[in-house]
């Protein structure tokens, strides 16, 4: 017996279930393409929704910030790592998000797992959408308070729960949802949720990770102009960079600076990352044409896939779940598409529910209509070999 026997046992269990995850080296190529093992593939599974990750301005400003402020922030922002470039980015972000204040955090996962525990005490109640991201689920667990799930995108069920819990003695109630759901590509009913939060004196926190850059006024998300207490989002998707943010009131920002363990005990983001974020925030507001192209191509692909009998759920965004059911079918389809020149990764449990394995297609503004049609044809060829 070895003290590490449990490691091999777990890996073997995953191999037997075809759920062993492995890493593949990827190199960016031109446009929306990547190179894997010498093969050029059109990438249809990245979150680089506006194609900004290799934009010259992001690269240039990352270099400029690194030259001015160095390679690293050297410490937590509460010690000596709060370089002046943070203020520059946060002030710009708050203006764009139409909130009094904003705070840069290190990653989307860190944000959700530190904001939720900060907002709640042991006597709180979190009302969470049933299909929320794993980072929200873990944030709820770390909050160590009561958690109730409401049916996915169902304001009526949420209202029922709010009524039922009104006089249960909770110190506060917090509703948490994604605005654009990462695995299903559908959007929450923001007006309904905001109305319920106001009517029932509940806090509302919205994860805008997959909406930032793509939806809303100037691409700043579906919460813009809405009465949402805590808006979390990321820079590693539509903005093409890395990191996360929370947009909120000035008082909440001060509260998070003092209460968010993930912020307090982490070294600040490197200046180069802040530079690329700063550049993205200059570019994104003026990219309405790219946003329209992206969403038009997604709508076109949904129609094309439907003609082949594929189920894309309730998707209404740049994310299209092509749901095929079994894990083996998703793996087979992924390999088939790679043979046709597309990188399209299979998404399987536990990332999605059992029997809902899928190819998660996520389009970019760099994809042309011809790219989308070729992808649709490849799906059709798998359906009708």
Curated annotation (Swiss-Prot):
Pathway: Cofactor biosynthesis; biotin biosynthesis. It catalyses: 6-carboxyhexanoyl-[ACP] + L-alanine + H(+) = (8S)-8-amino-7-oxononanoate + holo-[ACP] + CO2. It is an enzyme of class 2 (transferase). Its EC number is 2.3.1.47. Its cofactor is pyridoxal 5'-phosphate. The keyword Transmembrane helix does not apply. Pyridoxal 5'-phosphate binds at residues 108-109, 182, 207-210, 234-237. InterPro entries: Aminotransferase_I/II_large, AON_synthase_class-II, AONS_Archaea/Proteobacteria, PyrdxlP-dep_Trfase, PyrdxlP-dep_Trfase_major, PyrdxlP-dep_Trfase_small. One of its GO terms (molecular function) is 8-amino-7-oxononanoate synthase activity. Belongs to the class-II pyridoxal-phosphate-dependent aminotransferase family. BioF subfamily. Catalyzes the decarboxylative condensation of pimeloyl-[acyl-carrier protein] and L-alanine to produce 8-amino-7-oxononanoate (AON), [acyl-carrier protein], and carbon dioxide. This is Putative 8-amino-7-oxononanoate synthase.
